[in-house]
């Protein structure tokens, strides 16, 4: 139940503000994630033909793959507004109620890190997601009474890097569940090319390829690297990004040919050198490299595992033969 006096939306919701934002606004402009894009196109078109709100959508996968961008696209395609918040910000039932009661029909509510919602907030979400209703408490003590408030039909888009941490009752209320995968190099080249054009940058195919290869399959990283390579090119190469310029800039940034940064290399080399290739438990590994276990699980490991440099086993993490080859090291034993 929600106390009516606690409905204050100001500090917990932000209208989407596309200031100097070149991210795609429509599905037709969305690069990559072909299966997700085609499925969402059908689901959105069907909902619009019926005049309904789109079913609630759960997006999961490693960080930086476009979950927020896709939420904005859904709002645009449904001709509604996007309201954004995150799981940790929603601390009280009144926080969520304030957001929901300010929505318009077919608006999209985007909750990032939805796996971090408190049980109290989840309980409020259930009737809102299923019946578009809220339970509100009016008054106090013996005179208090509960009323149900109808809210407009809306779409909840939840994003998470840890789908296993979402409770089953919440997960089961999402009609559409989509996993975002790491991007192939070609798709990243197209994303970088479009961003470079928007920024009026001069970049060759070789420059595009070099940045894309080192971007860990992640658009967010690709665009961050593009901005840093742009800085390097403006200072040392008259603003033109060629293969050699991109290579020199990325080497200076300590991003190697596999896309590894300092932390990636440290993680693998600690397993190889200190733990003889593994297996090593997550807690020991976190202590050895001075990182939180959540950072290792959510940020570092997914790409290393997907690319075949690291294995998770019941006994712990193991550096693969591919990791040894990358560092030109000899395995002390078979893996």
UniProtKB/Swiss-Prot annotation:
Location of the region described as Large ATPase domain (RuvB-L) in the Swiss-Prot/TrEMBL record: 4-183
Pfam hit, one: RuvB_N
Enzyme Commission identifier(s): 3.6.4.-
Keyword Nuclease carried by entry: no
Region annotation Head domain (RuvB-H): where it falls in the sequence: 257-335
Binding residues annotated for Mg(2+), in chain numbering: 68
Location in or out of the cell: Cytoplasm
Signal peptide (residue range): none
One Gene Ontology term of the molecular function aspect: four-way junction DNA binding
GO biological process: DNA recombination; DNA repair
Annotated coiled-coil segments of the chain: none
Record-listed ATP binding positions: 23, 64, 67-69, 130-132, 173, 183, 220
Record-annotated disulphide pairs: none
Location of region: Small ATPAse domain (RuvB-S): 184-254
UniProt-annotated binding residues for DNA: 293, 312, 317
Listed CDD domains: AAA
Entry keyword set: ATP-binding, Cytoplasm, DNA damage, DNA recombination, DNA repair, DNA-binding, Hydrolase, Nucleotide-binding
Record GO cellular component, one term: Holliday junction resolvase complex
Family label: Belongs to the RuvB family.
UniProt function note: The RuvA-RuvB-RuvC complex processes Holliday junction (HJ) DNA during genetic recombination and DNA repair, while the RuvA-RuvB complex plays an important role in the rescue of blocked DNA replication forks via replication fork reversal (RFR). RuvA specifically binds to HJ cruciform DNA, conferring on it an open structure. The RuvB hexamer acts as an ATP-dependent pump, pulling dsDNA into and through the RuvAB complex. RuvB forms 2 homohexamers on either side of HJ DNA bound by 1 or 2 RuvA tetramers; 4 subunits per hexamer contact DNA at a time.
Subunit structure: Homohexamer. Forms an RuvA(8)-RuvB(12)-Holliday junction (HJ) complex. HJ DNA is sandwiched between 2 RuvA tetramers; dsDNA enters through RuvA and exits via RuvB. An RuvB hexamer assembles on each DNA strand where it exits the tetramer. Each RuvB hexamer is contacted by two RuvA subunits (via domain III) on 2 adjacent RuvB subunits; this complex drives branch migration. In the full resolvosome a probable DNA-RuvA(4)-RuvB(12)-RuvC(2) complex forms which resolves the HJ.
Protein name (Swiss-Prot/TrEMBL): Holliday junction branch migration complex subunit RuvB
């Amino acid at each position: 139940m929600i106390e009516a006096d606690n409905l204050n939306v100001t500090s917990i919701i932000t209208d989407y503000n596309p200031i100097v934002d070149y991210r795609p606004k429509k599905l037709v402009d969305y690069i990559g994630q072909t299966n997700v894009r085609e499925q969402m196109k059908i689901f959105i078109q069907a909902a619009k033909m019926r005049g309904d709100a789109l079913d609630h959508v759960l997006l999961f996968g490693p960080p930086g793959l476009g979950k927020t961008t896709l939420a904005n696209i859904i709002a645009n395609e449904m001709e509604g507004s996007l309201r954004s918040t995150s799981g940790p910000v929603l601390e009280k039932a009144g926080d969520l109620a304030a957001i929901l009661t300010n929505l318009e029909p077919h608006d999209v509510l985007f909750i990032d890190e939805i796996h971090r919602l408190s049980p109290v907030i989840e309980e409020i979400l259930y009737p809102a997601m299923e019946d578009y209703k809220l339970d509100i408490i009016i008054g106090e003590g013996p005179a208090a009474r509960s009323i149900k408030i109808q809210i407009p039909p809306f779409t909840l888009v939840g994003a998470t890097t840890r789908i296993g941490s979402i409770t089953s009752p919440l997960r089961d209320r999402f009609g559409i569940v989509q996993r975002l995968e790491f991007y192939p190099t070609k798709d990243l080249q197209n994303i970088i090319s479009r961003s470079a054009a928007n920024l009026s940058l001069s970049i060759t195919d070789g420059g595009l390829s070099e940045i894309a290869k080192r971007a860990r399959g992640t658009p967010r990283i690709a665009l961050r690297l593009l901005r840093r390579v742009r800085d390097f090119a403006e200072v040392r190469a008259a603003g033109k990004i060629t293969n050699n310029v991109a290579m020199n800039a990325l080497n200076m940034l300590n991003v190697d040919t596999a896309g590894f940064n300092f932390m990636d290399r440290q993680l693998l080399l600690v397993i190889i050198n200190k733990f003889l290739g593994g297996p090593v438990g997550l807690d020991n590994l976190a202590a050895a490299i001075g990182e939180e276990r959540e950072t290792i699980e959510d940020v570092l490991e997914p790409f290393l595992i997907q690319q075949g440099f690291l294995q998770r086993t019941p006994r712990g993490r193991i550096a693969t033969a591919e990791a040894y080859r990358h560092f030109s090291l000899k395995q002390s034993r078979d893996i």
